[in-house]
């Protein structure tokens, strides 16, 4: 079966409707979906252009969080398959509350300040990626630790982009693991440390794609590093998440809850 192109249309960043679309589409694992986010569709010209783009795309679906009915109409009038967050949810909420909804143009999260906070968190995650700028670790909400390629960077960026959390990440190198002690840069920050680990075979496959045939990518090397890292984290009572069968969304949700 051919896949579907899924357009996530929003009058702001598109993060909310993209998350909704991913959650819904995950219920259909046998079908392939390609997500395209169309953010900041906040006037008629942009809505017409976006609807036109979708209309010429084969097997297209639209998930929309447009708050303005006039903008939503461009997609409906084009005869597209539209799944609209506000059109389906808001009327039900209005009936319960006895209060009409007021379109807020993307301010569903207090967006102006919230958006700035998320972008600041993303910049922080990039500045403190892979052990960079350890002198600023004290500013982090969470510090992700683990051996190379266990998913620290994408998880830190997801936490920043979706939750506004300032997440740093710090690699545990073979030299660190040989010392049987936490790297000095991490020692003052124990309450904020969170460990990530993987099945050795999964880690080896990820590393093999980066450095084929290397010792770094061997299952034996991966198992040795992971075992040493897990012992080190356990010795310091640092919470550890096995990400082998988890999506980055699930990992981030677990970390946020912690």
From Swiss-Prot:
NCBIfam families xref list: PRK05339.1
Source organism of this protein record: Thiobacillus denitrificans (strain ATCC 25259 / T1)
Keyword Transferase: yes
Family: Belongs to the pyruvate, phosphate/water dikinase regulatory protein family. PSRP subfamily.
Top-rank lineage group of the source organism: Bacteria
Reaction(s) this enzyme catalyzes, per UniProt: [pyruvate, water dikinase] + ADP = [pyruvate, water dikinase]-phosphate + AMP + H(+); [pyruvate, water dikinase]-phosphate + phosphate + H(+) = [pyruvate, water dikinase] + diphosphate
Binding-site residues for ADP, renumbered to this chain: 146-153
Entry EC no(s): 2.7.11.33, 2.7.4.28
Record-linked InterPro entries: Kinase-pyrophosphorylase, PSRP
Transferase is among the record's keywords: yes
Name of the protein in question: Putative phosphoenolpyruvate synthase regulatory protein
UniProt keyword terms in alphabetical order: Kinase, Nucleotide-binding, Serine/threonine-protein kinase, Transferase
Molecular function in Gene Ontology: ADP binding; ATP binding; phosphotransferase activity, phosphate group as acceptor; protein serine/threonine kinase activity
Organism phylogeny: Bacteria, Pseudomonadati, Pseudomonadota, Betaproteobacteria, Nitrosomonadales
Role description: Bifunctional serine/threonine kinase and phosphorylase involved in the regulation of the phosphoenolpyruvate synthase (PEPS) by catalyzing its phosphorylation/dephosphorylation.
Pfam family, one: Kinase-PPPase
PANTHER family named among the record's database cross-references: PYRUVATE, PHOSPHATE DIKINASE REGULATORY PROTEIN 1, CHLOROPLASTIC (PTHR31756:SF3)
């Amino acid at each position: 079966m051919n896949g579907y192109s899924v357009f996530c249309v929003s009058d702001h960043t598109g993060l909310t409707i993209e998350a909704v679309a991913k959650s819904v589409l995950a219920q259909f694992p046998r079908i392939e979906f390609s997500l395209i986010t169309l953010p900041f569709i906040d006037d008629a010209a942009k809505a017409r252009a976006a609807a036109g783009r979708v209309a010429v795309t084969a097997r297209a679906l639209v998930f929309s969080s447009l708050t303005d009915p006039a903008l939503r109409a461009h997609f409906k009038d084009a005869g597209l398959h539209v799944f609209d967050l506000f059109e389906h949810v808001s009327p039900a909420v209005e009936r319960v509350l006895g209060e009409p909804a007021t379109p807020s143009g993307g301010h569903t999260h207090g967006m102006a300040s919230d958006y700035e906070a998320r972008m600041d968190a993303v910049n922080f995650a990039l500045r403190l990626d892979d052990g960079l700028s350890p002198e600023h670790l004290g500013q982090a909400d969470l510090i992700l630790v683990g051996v190379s390629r266990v998913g620290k960077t994408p998880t830190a960026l997801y936490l920043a982009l979706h939750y506004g959390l300032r997440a740093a990440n710090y690699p545990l190198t073979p030299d660190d693991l040989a010392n049987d002690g936490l790297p000095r840069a991490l020692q003052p920050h124990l309450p904020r440390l969170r460990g990530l680990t993987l099945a050795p075979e999964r880690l080896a496959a990820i590393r093999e794609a980066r450095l084929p045939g290397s010792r770094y990518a061997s299952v034996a090397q991966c198992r040795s590093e992971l075992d040493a890292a897990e012992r080190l984290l356990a010795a310091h009572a640092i919470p550890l998440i096995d990400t082998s069968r988890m999506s980055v969304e699930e990992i981030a949700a677990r970390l946020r809850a912690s």
